[in-house]
Amino acid sequence: MIPTEDASARKREIEEKLKQEQETLSFIRESLEKSDQLTKGMVSILSSFESRLMQLENSIIPVHKQTENLQRLQENVDKTLSNMDHVISYYHVAKDTDKIIREGPAGRLYEYLACIAKIQKAVEYFQDNNPDSPELNTVKARFEKGKELLEAEFRSLLTRYSKPVPPVLILDAIGGDEDMEVQEEVTLEHLPEAVLQDIICISAWLVEYGRNQDFMNVYFQVRSSQLDRSIKGLKEHFRKNSATSAIHSPAVQTKRKETPTKKAPKRPVYIPGTIRKAQNLLKQYSQHGLDGKKGSNLTPLEGFEHDLRGVKHLSDEKHGATAGKDDVLDIEIDSYIHCISAFVKLAQSEYALLTEIIPEHHQKKTFDSLIQEALDNLMLEGDNIVSAARRAIMRHDYSAVLTIFPILRHLKQTKPDFDATLQGTAASTKNKLPALITSMETIGAKALEEFADSIKNDPDKEYNMPKDGTVHELTSNAILFLQQLLDFQETAGAMLASQVLGDTYNIPLDPRESSSSASSYSSEFSRKLLSTYIYKVLGNLQLNLSNKAKVYEDPALRAIFLHNNYNYILKSLEKSELIQLVAVTVKKVESSYRELIEQEIQNYQRSWLRVTEHLAERNIPDFQPGAKLKDKERQIIKDKFKGFNDGLEELCKIQKGWAVPDKEQRDTIRHAQKRVVSLTYKAFLQRCANISFTKNPEKYHRYSPEQVEDMIDRLFDTSA
């Protein structure tokens, strides 16, 4: 059982908690009553506010709607007035723009274009809203007038500011200073920048609103004229400077540039001196070879210390008469080569300018028309060169082909740039340069073939043969012609390849090359073809010289003649690069000529047999020293002395006037002859030393061995 005290305490505790809970409950009940009262008050206030708000809305909304309507009406009135003003302005456009249109766009292009824009809008308005109004005709006429003045301004700006490019600037553009390690790109400015921007602006307007292409015709006509004038100015520059060597071009100072492995130089390269020399000499032979003159026109090679005996060079008078023409020819060729490069550079510059002014879909056609005049003039000049060469070749003047070589080489070097520049033009335009190249290759190959045939078939003329047996002019001119080919090896080889395809010379094509076009044969094949051609010319020359030598009645002179010519050919081949070029296909050409030279020396030495045979031991009886000779035996010895003396004197007299220009060969021949004759003569004298065959020995023993050697030393020397 729970103790009584604890129960009482517990009871009191519970009663106290109950009392507290009752007090809390009473507080909550009072709070709820107050909250209900506040809620009822708030609901009453909100209900009153809503009622008043509805009353206010009912009074304000009608006023708002009325105000909104009034504002809309005001806006409509303003828009109507604005539109009326705008429409009325169209009726005044003609009057407002009259002064500016009449004065034209010069000096105020953008203001003028703004006026044109106003007129155009007026035209569009009347066309859409009142097509029958007289105002439409007025603004239309004003618009057409404005467009005409814009086109006139376009023409005026182009004409006024388009100037030919100065020749010096063109030469800088196509070549630059080759002495400079870093070449700066030369920019050709055809129009001032401000003028160019005006022209571009006018062009853009005419394209968009002008609705015609007349301005494009104007553009190509004006620029075409300036392009042609620029090229003609370059030609005139060369002509004016032809009297000096200081032309702004490296052509006259440049050494040979083209080899089969070297890259072509950037600036056109031409070697006037070699062409002029070759043409001078070859023309003299081809045109005056039948006038009775003889000898070679070629300057002696190293080792030929005397002028070739019997050679008649061009007289000063004759040379002076032709020198001017040769200089003109040099300038014309150099000029044409540079004009081709100038055309490409100027055409590239013109196209760059054109792309800023002419619409893209009209650019190629306009460019095609723009370049036609200058291109046609260049092609016509090239055709004239070909025609002149063709006429010269018909006259057997094969030196004319030397004019074609530098031009053809440059045309082929320029062709890639030419094709790239003319990309997109008409086929007839793009084919003009290839057609000229083909024409030059055809006439050049024909000239080379006919030259080879002419060497073989050159007639044997006694009066045209050198009396002293020196180098024949056919030899010197043939070698000179071949030496000129060294400057144009790739060009000449490709020229032959493009025409004969190797069949003429039995050179097989590489299978990889057989499908290529004629203009794309490998450099190696062209070099082989040229090597074979040169060997063919040398073979024809050798055959012709053998035939010509038969004109000489004296076998010794015949041998000297062939010796001189063969030696000259060999020396020329060795001095130039011809020997290496021929060796491409024929390895033993040098040894062949040395054998021929040695053979002719031996043939010449046989002429001395009629001298030394008198000293031969046959028919000479055995003599005993101090023995008395019979009359017949004495006469034999006398006849041998007399035969030797007369033969020696006769040969020395005749052969003294002959020529062996090569000092080394001359000394070799003399030395060999001295050795043979002197030994034979000394042996004969020694045998007859103690024999008394005459009372006057000095009558028969005229020359000592030393004197004989001295006489032989004076052979081939007219001054001795």
UniProtKB/Swiss-Prot annotation:
Family to which this protein belongs: Belongs to the EXO70 family.
Organism, as annotated: Danio rerio (Zebrafish)
GO cellular component term of the entry, any: Flemming body
PANTHER family: EXOCYST COMPLEX COMPONENT 7, EXOCYST COMPLEX PROTEIN EXO70
Pfam families: Exo70_C, Exo70_N
InterPro entries found in the cross-reference section: Cullin_repeat-like_dom_sf, Exo70, Exo70_C
Lineage: Eukaryota, Metazoa, Chordata, Craniata, Vertebrata
Region (Disordered): 249-268
This protein's name: Exocyst complex component 7
Broad class of the protein's primary localization: cytoplasm
GO molecular function annotations of the record: phosphatidylinositol-4,5-bisphosphate binding
Membrane topology, as annotated: Peripheral membrane protein
Subcellular location: Cytoplasm, Cytosol; Cell membrane; Midbody, Midbody ring
Residues in coiled coil: 5-34, 63-83
GO biological process terms held by the UniProt record: exocytosis; protein transport
PTM-bearing positions, type Phosphoserine: S133
Highest rank taxon of the organism: Eukaryota
Function: Component of the exocyst complex involved in the docking of exocytic vesicles with fusion sites on the plasma membrane. It is required for neuron survival and plays an essential role in telencephalon development.
UniProt KW keywords: Cell membrane, Coiled coil, Cytoplasm, Exocytosis, Membrane, Phosphoprotein, Protein transport, Transport
Record's comment describing the protein's domains: The C-terminus is required for translocation to the plasma membrane.
